[in-house]
Amino acid sequence: MKENKKTQFPINKTLSKINKKFLELKKSDKLALMPFIMAGDPNIETTSEILLKLQEKGADLIELGIPYSDPLADGPIIQLSASRALKSGTTLKNVIQLLESLKDKLHIPIILFTYFNPVLNFGLENFCELASKVGVSGLIIPDLPLEEAYKFSEIISSYSIDLILLVAPTTPSERMKIISNNTKGFTYLVSVTGVTGERNKMENRVENLITKLQEISINPVAVGFGISSPEHVNKVRKWGADGVIIGSAFVKRISNSNEKEVVNQIGKFCEEMRKAADQ
């Protein structure tokens, strides 16, 4: 499908909560630390505790996954996490209720990561209205093509929610320019081809992609997929990224910890990543 270049994404006239967070961090020369966890794994009550612990231990933003039965962009660790969350009875409605209960306690931007089908079934406008009321700042929909994003971005933006778009190493240059200049909040740079998951090393081409994105767009660049160690985080910082997203490494620790220890274990790992981000 050809890109509809006549259609424009809406232009935000005011800074969003995510914009303000990145500007605040840039002034302090800090890398934005963004953990990802799956809502409802192991259960909604523990997710609530983990969110507050991540905020306490230095997360600047949090990406919260909505469990879905067919998560195409996710590797086995996050797929299993989604499966556990669904088995525990987690629904999109539960997640909205969870965030409502934490609205006065969570002060950092919360970004929902969801596939499009759950949102479509819920109703996009209804979903955005409820998400906005409970303090959601951003939305990532990995299976929403750019051509479809044009249609929905205006509705999403009207509720003061940033629709965050993804760029991959295989994205053609012209399309990369369109995406990075029309994303809201930041550009999500997928550091590897394929699905999410831990990797042993970061590919050096990521540095070139960060530089390229910063040359063609004023939006911050956050790197995700495959980042699992303090060394990875430190490398991303040295390469000049504005933020780092860590998913599978957090999710794996949730799955490997018993319920009594999981919150503290996640807090300790978040502290490690915070130190690496600040070095």
From Swiss-Prot:
It is an enzyme of class 4 (lyase). One of its GO terms (cellular component) is cytosol. Tetramer of two alpha and two beta chains. It comes from Prochlorococcus marinus subsp. pastoris (strain CCMP1986 / NIES-2087 / MED4). Keywords: Amino-acid biosynthesis, Aromatic amino acid biosynthesis, Lyase, Tryptophan biosynthesis. It holds the Pfam family Trp_syntA. InterPro entries: Aldolase_TIM, RibuloseP-bd_barrel, Trp_synthase_alpha_AS, Trp_synthase_suA. Pathway: Amino-acid biosynthesis; L-tryptophan biosynthesis; L-tryptophan from chorismate: step 5/5. Coiled coil: none annotated. The alpha subunit is responsible for the aldol cleavage of indoleglycerol phosphate to indole and glyceraldehyde 3-phosphate. Its EC number is 4.2.1.20. This is Tryptophan synthase alpha chain. It catalyses: (1S,2R)-1-C-(indol-3-yl)glycerol 3-phosphate + L-serine = D-glyceraldehyde 3-phosphate + L-tryptophan + H2O. Belongs to the TrpA family. One of its GO terms (molecular function) is tryptophan synthase activity. The active site is at 63 (proton acceptor), 74 (proton acceptor).
